[in-house]
Amino acid sequence: MNNFLLDFLALGAVLSGILVITSKNPVISVLFLISVFVNVAGYLVLLGVGFIGISYLIVYIGAVTVLFLFVIMMLNLQLTELSAVGNEYTKNLPLATIIGSLLLFELVSVVPSFDGFYQLNSTTTIFKFLGVGILNWFNSLSLGVGNTFAFAEVNQTFNTFAADTQFANFLQIQSIGQVLYTNGALWLIVSSLILLLAMVGPITLSMNKKDSSPANQVNTVNRLVK
């Protein structure tokens, strides 16, 4: 039953992702994007990575998609304008097919512990590989979160030279925090600077640069007085 739910959620996420980019109505597209995040969150929870699954619901659905809806409503797009350019989607199908084939080839070539194309013989095999193989690969990394399954304590194996991690057991969220603020502290600071630039950059680019010279200010005051 658990494997069936994993396959169902993975298939739902893939189909919702396809509908996100094929829907002509931006509001409907955002709703399908919410469906993608819900399916992925459920998939992660069933795999045992409950904290990251709940974070998907809080961060992506609670903040990102709401921001998308706010921007779409603020732009006030007309459905007639969207339907007028809807026929142009079919012109890019050959290019989309080529890019999709290249991405599939890269996925099969780069992802480890994959023996060949012949394993893609069923939907269950594909999603089982994507769900278990990739997760085990990330768990084997030195900066990974190990076997951090929900509702179970895990041994801390990230910093083997620290004495306090040799005799302590950590929950999933404690394990992630241990890695994030010790081994990945530098990358956390770098990512925060990148997010700061991403926030300040659009504001700076969209600012209306006006002439603030004293002469211009005097002319503005004179126009207001008149």
Curated annotation (Swiss-Prot):
Species name: Mycosarcoma maydis (Corn smut fungus)
Catalytic activity line of the entry: a ubiquinone + NADH + 5 H(+)(in) = a ubiquinol + NAD(+) + 4 H(+)(out)
Protein name stated in the entry: NADH-ubiquinone oxidoreductase chain 6
Annotated InterPro entries: NADH_UbQ/plastoQ_OxRdtase_su6, Nuo/plastoQ_OxRdtase_6_NuoJ
Function comment: Core subunit of the mitochondrial membrane respiratory chain NADH dehydrogenase (Complex I) that is believed to belong to the minimal assembly required for catalysis. Complex I functions in the transfer of electrons from NADH to the respiratory chain. The immediate electron acceptor for the enzyme is believed to be ubiquinone.
Domain of life from the UniProt record: Eukaryota
GO molecular function, one term: NADH dehydrogenase (ubiquinone) activity
Residues annotated as transmembrane: 1-21, 27-47, 52-72, 94-114, 126-146, 185-205
Root EC class: translocase
